[in-house]
Amino acid sequence: MTTPVPVPNGGPAPAAVPAAAEPGSVGIVTPQLIRFDTPLPLASGQSLQSYELAVETYGTLNAGRTNAVLVCHALNASHHVAGLAADDPNDVGWWDNMVGPGKPLDTNRFFVIGVNNLGSCFGSTGPASINPATGHPWGAAFPVLTVEDWVHAQARLADHFGIERFAAVMGGSLGGMQALSWAITCPERVAHCIVIASTPRLSAQNIGFNEVARRAIITDPDFHGGDYYAHNTVPRRGLSVARMIGHITYLSDDDMAEKFGRTQREPAEGGAYRYGYDVEFEVESYLRYQGEKFSRYFDANTYLLITRALDYFDPARGTGGDLARALKPAQADFLLVSFSTDWRFPPERSREIVRALLKNGSPVTYAEIDAPHGHDAFLLDDARYHAVVRGYYERIARELGLDEPAAGAAPAAAEPACAEGCAA
């Protein structure tokens, strides 16, 4: 059984989102917390007996329930995809420039769902939630999750809304991995799969970045083995360093050079160095600021959990490394977008997915955008990038006969249509 209740929004906007809502915003939005009481089996062999998902929706679900789009979030984002949070008008959705009336993903035509993943810290059940077996926060005892676990939880959310098949599942970065997993795991439930700035698996270098970030957190004296809640403390130093490491990988070398170069923060007289170990350069000040800000709102155990889910994602692992064979179950049409200066998930990784899809005869559209902003480009305004996404959704709208805005709300189903997996 599922039960929706309103909850305060807990998802602050990441650094790359705009400071104010874009024209054509969906306006003020209030999230819901939807409870699931059917146990969710996990890839680890464990299960969650019950759990809650924080959700926001935009637009209107049409009578046939055919115009739904699921937006999957990246590492530090949340269900707050678009609009202004009801409890904080300064909290703008992390993809507000993409989702809304008249925007590339047009909420005048599509019913858009944003969901906070299990294990996160913005409302859905996660390490900071109360473990019903103990009456205390889960902490380190919260199960390790995979991208596939998230997809199974999201499929139950689709059941809650009575959605048998999504018009599209869309995501950038880790969100793109979820979209790809949807196409493999629940092929009959995805008409279009939109994968942006993503990869079919993490490289050794990327796993290395994640491990260094995790070690920074775990070795913080305030971590207390993951049970820092009981000690009324937070491993802020480790979490701050983890964010600094991650933030470097989200920006391109050229972008950092243009933003900061070798500009000194507060040089000594005549521009001399100060010959110390405090902040000397502007880039150091920026990274410290980003790290400290992040450590004030993100949960350290969630950071460990999500980076490990990133590490584990590898759909071709079960097919001897043959990505085409791993993608063979997919029935969706695909759009892939990459960015020229993204060195975290470079264009070659998207092209690898494209080649595998073409080998299978899957319909695929691919765009490589020449943009200077690195991995974070998928969050930013870029006319060429947005034109590609807009054009693709125009095609979906034509296929569904959505030339006019959706009319007549279809109420969400009171009970899930299925209890397990992806069967509608």
Swiss-Prot record:
Residues involved in substrate binding: 243, 376
Assigned GO CC terms: cytoplasm
Task performed by this protein: Transfers a succinyl group from succinyl-CoA to L-homoserine, forming succinyl-L-homoserine. In vitro, also has serine succinyl transferase activity.
Gene name in the database record: metXS
Site (Important for acyl-CoA specificity): 344
Originating organism: Bordetella petrii (strain ATCC BAA-461 / DSM 12804 / CCUG 43448)
Catalytic activity: L-homoserine + succinyl-CoA = O-succinyl-L-homoserine + CoA
Pfam families: Abhydrolase_1
The protein's annotated pathway: Amino-acid biosynthesis; L-methionine biosynthesis via de novo pathway; O-succinyl-L-homoserine from L-homoserine: step 1/1
AB hydrolase-1 domain: residues covered: 67-381
Name used for this protein in its record: Homoserine O-succinyltransferase
Residues annotated as transmembrane: none
Subunit field text: Homodimer.
